[in-house]
């Protein structure tokens, strides 16, 4: 699945995402509560000459978990190694990474909830006591050797913290949840990105793009690039409110930040199931979509913005959705 409002990175975005990524806490707009706490924790660890406690960053995709991990490493003056859970298939894969870490390095694991159980459990002693057991040989000749690791900080990023086993989750001394950004923070991000990308944009244009960006910086930056194209071809090169409205309407992003799939979800619940409640598996089957995709990609924003409610009996359309999005049909 690839959509312009997708929070996960899509193919080809890595290079310009890195260009736009803040390198310091001071350049990171939004998430003030999380940011201020991390600054204190990092400063205290540096003062003691220790590695920072292990950090778990939770929240929907595109909110800055990877960026914060890099800022933590930069602020600590530490090396960072980056990987993702699907790339760590076996204990040996993890052992190779852990044994290569320098003192006080940061190890970032994206999608950490997708680690297999045996790999997850292999991290326990590494996180608590900085050692792992390495098995050499096979069969009756196999023996276990204790390998001491350099002190390090594990930073895990997850969109589904509830899937982590409690013993694993409890080993993170710092657990923070990132929230969707407000429009002012997104406007600041857009103005900064426009300056880096050399895009002419006025305040009203930035506000309009921010309003439709689903509270997600990655989406905001992606929309900025597409609106820039319309400004260059259909306008005078400046991203104004008028050109932003025109471009985003052409891209199928409405005034609420919803796209066609979002509206299909809402219409399905309202029209086919009388507003709900309806189970997530039923919705997934009706839309020919994966349950995980609905729960991780679409639902967080729809719930956050008050379009649907999640109940024990299923999903329910809210009065706000009926009087806004669905009233515009």
Curated annotation (Swiss-Prot):
Residues 255-329 are annotated as: Head domain (RuvB-H). Transmembrane segments: none annotated. GO terms for molecular function: ATP binding; ATP hydrolysis activity; four-way junction DNA binding; four-way junction helicase activity. One of its GO terms (biological process) is DNA repair. It is found in: Cytoplasm. Keywords: ATP-binding, Cytoplasm, DNA damage, DNA recombination, DNA repair, DNA-binding, Hydrolase, Nucleotide-binding. It catalyses: ATP + H2O = ADP + phosphate + H(+). Residues 11-20 have a biased composition (Basic and acidic residues). InterPro entries: AAA+_ATPase, AAA_lid_4, DNA_helicase_Holl-junc_RuvB, P-loop_NTPase, RuvB-like_N, RuvB_C, WH-like_DNA-bd_sf, WH_DNA-bd_sf. Its main location: cytoplasm. DNA binds at residues 291, 310, 315. ATP binds at residues 20-21, 62, 65-67, 128-130, 171, 181, 218. SUPFAM superfamilies: P-loop containing nucleoside triphosphate hydrolases (SSF52540), Winged helix' DNA-binding domain (SSF46785). Residues 182-252 are annotated as: Small ATPAse domain (RuvB-S). Mg(2+) binds at residue 66. GO terms for cellular component: cytoplasm; Holliday junction resolvase complex. Has 3 domains, the large (RuvB-L) and small ATPase (RuvB-S) domains and the C-terminal head (RuvB-H) domain. The head domain binds DNA, while the ATPase domains jointly bind ATP, ADP or are empty depending on the state of the subunit in the translocation cycle. During a single DNA translocation step the structure of each domain remains the same, but their relative positions change. The RuvA-RuvB-RuvC complex processes Holliday junction (HJ) DNA during genetic recombination and DNA repair, while the RuvA-RuvB complex plays an important role in the rescue of blocked DNA replication forks via replication fork reversal (RFR). RuvA specifically binds to HJ cruciform DNA, conferring on it an open structure. The RuvB hexamer acts as an ATP-dependent pump, pulling dsDNA into and through the RuvAB complex. RuvB forms 2 homohexamers on either side of HJ DNA bound by 1 or 2 RuvA tetramers; 4 subunits per hexamer contact DNA at a time. This is Holliday junction branch migration complex subunit RuvB. It comes from Bdellovibrio bacteriovorus (strain ATCC 15356 / DSM 50701 / NCIMB 9529 / HD100). The lineage of its organism: Bacteria, Pseudomonadati, Bdellovibrionota, Bdellovibrionia, Bdellovibrionales. The gene is ruvB.
